[in-house]
Amino acid sequence: MNPDLRRERDSASFNPELLTHILDGSPEKTRRRREIENMILNDPDFQHEDLNFLTRSQRYEVAVRKSAIMVKKMREFGIADPDEIMWFKKLHLVNFVEPVGLNYSMFIPTLLNQGTTAQKEKWLLSSKGLQIIGTYAQTEMGHGTHLRGLETTATYDPETQEFILNSPTVTSIKWWPGGLGKTSNHAIVLAQLITKGKGYGLHAFIVPIREIGTHKPLPGITVGDIGPKFGYDEIDNGYLKMDNYRIPRENMLMKYAQVKPDGTYVKPLSNKLTYGTMVFVRSFLVGEAARALSKACTIAIRYSAVRHQSEIKPGEPEPQILDFQTQQYKLFPLLATAYAFQFVGAYMKETYHRINEGIGQGDLSELPELHALTAGLKAFTSWTANTGIEACRMACGGHGYSHCSGLPNIYVNFTPSCTFEGENTVMMLQTARFLMKSYDQVHSGKLVCGMVSYLNDLPSQRIQPQQVAVWPTMVDIHSPESLTEAYKLRAARLVEIAAKNLQKEVIHRKSKEVAWNLTSVDLVRASEAHCHYVVVKLFSEKLLKIQDKAIQAVLRNLCLLYSLYGISQNAGDFLQGSIMTEPQITQVNQRVKELLTLIRSDAVALVDAFDFQDVTLGSVLGRYDGNVYENLFEWAKNSPLNKAEVHESYKHLKSLQSKL
């Protein structure tokens, strides 16, 4: 054990094990997660060479092989609980992604949420065992987030009781679905439904694309891999073109919308019910943002405790770089953010399942806010985590640029989250649409509930500076509850600004669509402020549920740092809204620096509490034992370029040197 890390752990003010239990949900969940992780760590079938040194084709082959082993092992060990499946999957491929991932994250959830009982009986068991390997084919070459613009068609033929699927244009070719290129034999295809000559919008269809047994594409199907990408080397993101391809009527998922044998269309209770899978994935992605940022913080903070550089005072020993205030300022707000997102992710998971149960009972009342909240928080957390991961990499200096740090892999494999399942700016605008509707309700004298209930407090449906002029004396920068109120006022103010600017543009431009576009910057800022408020609120409320005093104290410091750092980075909003005064902003900036000092002694213990196995981090720099330099040298020696003392390419240089 590196002596610096041992000293850091000995000086912690709390027991990291107890905090791990809180993050997992209970001591029993921690015990079971570790039990599952050890199944993999102690199983020789899951050992493999470092994927960093393999070609893309080799990485894909390893990923497919290990995915097949994973399914067999889960069956052998009786792992069926969704959380346990996630733990198992997260460790078996370390920091990399799996070709069959969408089978479990989208194909099966869509079948569960939108399939009839008969459809689930037909396909569910086979998809869980990978006899059917499914993917989710929504995005097309020409359209992604704009779902209504998708061009793939499914035209019903009542004579044969079949749907005829077509990709009528080049831009209608399905493009990007993971596992589509070479792995999957089925796809849930989103297509424009046409029956009796009339279009009814997007619906989901289960489409066989390869013959089971030979794995060859079926007649009418053109399918393949789209080529190398920024990351995701193990995933065969693919394309799918369909030419008059017929599937039975029963292959349309019909839990909500239906097409009768004669072609009669039966509409669902709500069109948004067909977007259930996207809402599920977006809520899941909030937790994934927390996980990715937590891993990056673990690597950067451990390395910063091991790395010694420069001199604070001439002639003195080189300090740990974690002792530099600038390094703390880079990393500790990100650590606070990681914890905030951990708690928000747990909230979103719980909220999704609660509301989804209600939807199953026919209660759609909370669906609009769930859709808006998952869209906004997916964007807010993924943008923040993506920027934060890169900041952690840069905080590790030159070694952070090496794949040995694990940070490049974390970054390139997380960054697609800013685009898939809804491009983030568009997601923020979807949240803004809900905020504008809520504002209009309040303006018309109605009350709103849920996370937007703060809009009910708008005095006479307006926030005016003179009406909140007394507010600055009320803000307590040492109180999470008081800071939550400040964020609430900021959100309300920016929502009102966006709403009033939108109204002005509507009057001036006459067209709501043009007005919306010309107000979109304000609308995105309103959504960001709303999401920021939600995160601060949930973090603050989580503190009240923590019973261990030492853990509550350190989490309170993190909550304060997250809230105050956000104010310092958005000071203009709090000043312009007369929510805080300039002297208070100065106090905020000073308090942020004080909190850096308070958190310093607990930083390593806080990342230890995330409880990532070394193999999960995939990082030489973030090793639990802190033995960085010895292992960095060993890692480099494994480079394929080092297999020969003289590389075969030397012949090109030798010919030049012979002329000297």
UniProtKB/Swiss-Prot annotation:
It comes from Pongo abelii. The active site is at residue 421. Involved in the initial and rate-limiting step of peroxisomal beta-oxidation of straight-chain saturated and unsaturated very-long-chain fatty acids. Catalyzes the desaturation of fatty acyl-CoAs such as palmitoyl-CoA (hexadecanoyl-CoA) to 2-trans-enoyl-CoAs ((2E)-enoyl-CoAs) such as (2E)-hexadecenoyl-CoA, and donates electrons directly to molecular oxygen (O(2)), thereby producing hydrogen peroxide (H(2)O(2)). The modification Phosphoserine is found at residues 26, 649. This is Peroxisomal acyl-coenzyme A oxidase 1. A motif (Microbody targeting signal) lies at residues 658-660. The lineage of its organism: Eukaryota, Metazoa, Chordata, Craniata, Vertebrata. Its EC number is 1.3.3.6. Pathway: Lipid metabolism; peroxisomal fatty acid beta-oxidation. The modification N6-acetyllysine is found at residues 216, 255, 267, 272, 437, 446, 500, 512, 637, 651. GO terms for molecular function: acyl-CoA oxidase activity; FAD binding; fatty acid binding; palmitoyl-CoA oxidase activity; PDZ domain binding; protein homodimerization activity. Keywords: Acetylation, FAD, Fatty acid metabolism, Flavoprotein, Lipid metabolism, Oxidoreductase, Peroxisome, Phosphoprotein. The record marks 468-469 as: Cleavage. GO terms for biological process: alpha-linolenic acid metabolic process; fatty acid catabolic process; fatty acid derivative biosynthetic process; fatty acid oxidation; generation of precursor metabolites and energy; hydrogen peroxide biosynthetic process; lipid homeostasis; lipid metabolic process. It is found in: Peroxisome. Its cofactor is FAD. Belongs to the acyl-CoA oxidase family. Pfam families: ACOX (PF01756), ACOX_C_alpha1 (PF22924), Acyl-CoA_dh_M (PF02770), Acyl-CoA_ox_N (PF14749).
